[in-house]
Amino acid sequence: MALSLQQKITDPNQGVYLIGTTPPKAGTAEDKTQRIAKKLLARLNEVEYDGLVVYDIQDESSRVSSERPFPFHATLDPREYSLLLRKLARRDVITYKSVAQRDAAEFRDWLGETARDYQLQNLVLVGSPSSNGTIKLSLADAYRELAEHPADVYLGGVAIAERHASKGNEHQRLIEKSAQGCQFFITQAVYNAQATIDLL
């Protein structure tokens, strides 16, 4: 019997290859969303991969003072796109969730909906892109809320090797996130191999 994505991630002898994608723009018609998903999966037809990652895109204009090269566009709910991709690809999906825009009660409702309506268990929670702007729920508070919630979640976190290169403390962040419930970590891309090696 094939191993689940959780089993592969948990087993240090298994390599895990994930493909990341973003949901289509908010307001995209259902039939067009289906076509986009099928086109993505057709491109991946010849690739051996273990699962898909669906990112939750947030407005990061508070992170930098200069104007972004591309304006922010809201996307469809990542849970909806995750559900569609899981159904079409018949592979496990990891769904990202940006937690800063909702307060604790809204986040608890979101967790309940995610378990009940979408049957999604593999989640990566991400915090605010910067300390500027409105933060309704911190990442640490979201981890606490999740720990007290009955939803069965396989929780992942984000590891940023470049942050380790500049601040030297990413390993401490990973240890803290592990203590807060993270069971695996994802690096979105390796821009600097040496920074990644140093972090590991």
Residues covered by each model-derived region:
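Short catalytic-loop micro-motif centered on adjacent basic/acidic residues
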Residues: 94-97, 184-189
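Active-site beta->alpha loop and helix N-cap motifs at the rims of alpha/beta catalytic domains
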Residues: 2-169
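A long, hydrophobic alpha-helical segment
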Residues: 184-185, 193, 197-198
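C-terminal helical cap(s) of enzyme catalytic domains, especially alpha/beta-barrels
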Residues: 133-134, 196-200
